Amino acid sequence: MSQSTRARTSNFARTLLRFLLVWVVDAISLLLTATLYAGISFAGIAGVPVIVQAFAATFLLSIVNLLIRPLILLLARPLGFIAVFIIGFLVNGAALLITSFLLPTFEVSGWISAIVGGLVFAAINVFLTGIAEANDDGSFYQGVIERLARRRSFTNIDPQTRGLVLMEIDGLSYHHLKKALADGLMPSLEYLMDNEGYVLSHVDCGIPSQTSACQAGIMFGDNTDIPAFRWYDKDKRKLYVSGNDATELNGRYANGNGLMRGGSSINNMLNGDADKSLLTLAGMFDGDAEEKKRRAEDVYLLMLNPYFLTRTIIFLFVDVVREVWQGWQQRRRDIYPRLNRLAHGYPFVRAITTVFMRDIAANLTILDIIRGAPTIYVTWPGYDEVAHHSGPWTGDAFKVLKTYDSTIARVYRTIRDKAPRPYDLIILSDHGQSFGPTFKQRYGISLKEFIEQLLPQGITVAQSMGGDTGVISLNAASGELSNIRDSGVGGIGGQVIAERGQRVLDNMVQEQESSDGTPEADKPAQVTAYGSGNLAQVYFDLLPRKISLNELNQAYPAMVDTLVSHEGIGIVCGYEDDGTPVVLGKSGRRNLHTGALTGEDPLLMYAPDAPDAFGHASLETRAWQVRRVMDFPHAGDLMVISTVYPDGTVAALEELIGNHGGLGGEQTDAFLFHPADMRITQTRNSADVFHILNDHRDLPLSETPREPADREDTADDWSLGNLWSGIKDVSSWMPLLARALVFDRLAYVEIAKSGKMTGPALLIGCVFAALAGGLRTASGLDTRAIFGNVAWWFVGVLAILVAGRLLNRSSGASYTQTMRAVGFAQAGNIIGLAGLIPPLAPLALFASTVYTFCT
């Protein structure tokens, strides 16, 4: 069988499997709708179970929808996506009425019942589809959207070189990802490790460990003079806030050689010289009318799928409820530390970052993969946002991380099945997150209040911390809605909704920023502390330049020494009279230019020796990182970093219990999850990651395919956790099942080698062996025949293994590997279902026997 024929056959099998899965979900949804809503019902027929009637009704409903969906798009598309959404629900009601007319046992009592029933059916269907992890791949609307997207393909597609798809999980540390993998929360990544030879590598992002500095480093190879997320420029007398000033920062580093040159930036702060940017703060309101219209049309394309919009809205509100529930559980159990998770509309901010931005960004990424963009960089901020408020080690954070695994799997399948060029999929983080009660929670006082106590009465102090949170995504979404409105895309209704949505998002941004304590322009302060996480840049207005420690001591005697001596302060960095930066600790002092030490090295707590320690790095690396920031022209007069406590936690200087921006703990422990042939060099700043990725970009295809390392079976393959984790990961084993059904030999090799396939193989083998036993029973339900057939199946697996060993003594296959392959092969018994129709029974038995022989 040729490769193209195999691909077409495999696609057909996948389509068939998807149809069967959707059919089952639709039947259950319709049955539940009839149970919950009186306007829809099934008339009882003697000897015909209601579930059979539900399957018949949904089959007819799918045919009706298939015929009228093109009409929906034809009529509604010129009116905008809101018209598609509304007309879609009206047509759902019409489809239910038509189905009730064609199938007398299915009853719908009028138009109102049809429309309301359609809404109930859609809501239940979305919920069940989410549980089954059945996405829109292969659906009618997705097919239309992808065909329209290809009309704007990238022109620089080279099928002989590798493209890059870079998926950033904001704020996920190397250590937290290792735990997620160990707990079976990321089966897609485990699949890539087992079958594609992927490797997880540690990256030190340096300081400041926050998004603007890290993305500038990763995307441009330069993040000079970004001393914190917020900082003050004494020369310009301007407060810089990375999110608000992303366009200026991007222009500082852009030179045409960024990582995404010629490619696409999706949901980022900076754009890496991308030709096309969406949901990216840098250049959000710049660009010509053509570029803005192209962005608006991409978002509009997604909205043509009413099910996508429905699902996203429903799951957004589900996540709001989940956050309220999790916050209540945290309070009920008196878990400490904790925050007020209802303040400033946080549940909605969380839902937008975890659900809305995830789904929108993932679908935009898929469109650009189909178009052949040379490099695509997309960020998901959901984990970072939840970890900030719940804590990075909590179940809340890991649960939301698990939801992103299916998104990774979907992008991987798109690369494998639909991309016009080869891609390397790389998962990475910009920085990690550290954990602990905040400075104020520990000591009952903020850094601002503590500094005020050390200054003469009348000296005003202001503090503005944070901002590297979900606010970035709110601003990005607001900007794209503004662009849709200004570009005239989406119809009148769509533009009205875009304007209202933008207003809501802008209000949410203002609410969030009001909690940051940004100094008001008409109330200048003499001392200001800016930054994020456990790092603050402190500026004094005594002089329009950097102020030395001696000058500060003369103006405010004992202030610096008292600051250093506080239990919660780890180091205070300042300047000698000649501008040389120094680090002050409780028991020592370090000259950052010469390395000269007095007493104990104050950086020691930030450089643990153990290779697996949180924040592991050499003293030389930490000294280089701190010196580099202090040498920035616009670093503060003082740089304050909180201490690392004996339990490994840190104290954020802002009110977030999961934090990043400075040193200590996991916040500098970023990661790269990459193909084995990617060369990883030592890193001490995110700018080093640029060179690693850029060197891998546009590489010619390898003449030999990558082979995953052979994997030995372990007892863990049969653990209940592994079995259940594999079974739940439908998005991984369903494509393999489709390929196995069409005799794809490579699929069977992947199945046999993957420990995650043990559970699915056991399920498929037992279910279809039982099915075969039941179908061979002439009358009634013979449980002995069913269980006997399952038992004989296990014996048959052993017989196949023994025969294979006798025929090929070099075979290294184990019983478990053989069981996996034979288990998936059992799916061919699905043909036997046709035997339930008496006239087709002999043909079904013959076809099933032939298929079993072929496998």
Language-model segment annotations:
Residues D137-S139, G221-P374, T379-G391, G494, ...:
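His/Asp/Glu-rich, glycine-adjacent segments
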Residues K179-A216, G221-D225:
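Short, structured active-site-proximal loop/turn typified by the sulfatase FGly-forming signature C/S-X-P-X-R
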Residues L239, G243-R252, G262, I266-D273, ...:
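Active-site neighborhoods of enzymes that stabilize oxyanions during catalysis
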Residues S2, V22-I28, N722-A813:
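Selected alpha-helical membrane-embedding segments in polytopic membrane proteins
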Residues F140-G197, Q441-R442:
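Active-site-proximal N-terminal segment of extracellular/periplasmic enzymes that hydrolyze or transfer
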Residues V355-F356, I360, D368, I376, ...:
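A long, amphipathic alpha-helix that forms part
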Residues F42-A56, L60, F81-I82, G780-I837:
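Alpha-helical transmembrane segments with an aromatic anchor "belt"
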Residues S406-S446, P581-L584, M639-I641:
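Metal-dependent active-site segment of extracytoplasmic phospho-/sulfohydrolases and closely related
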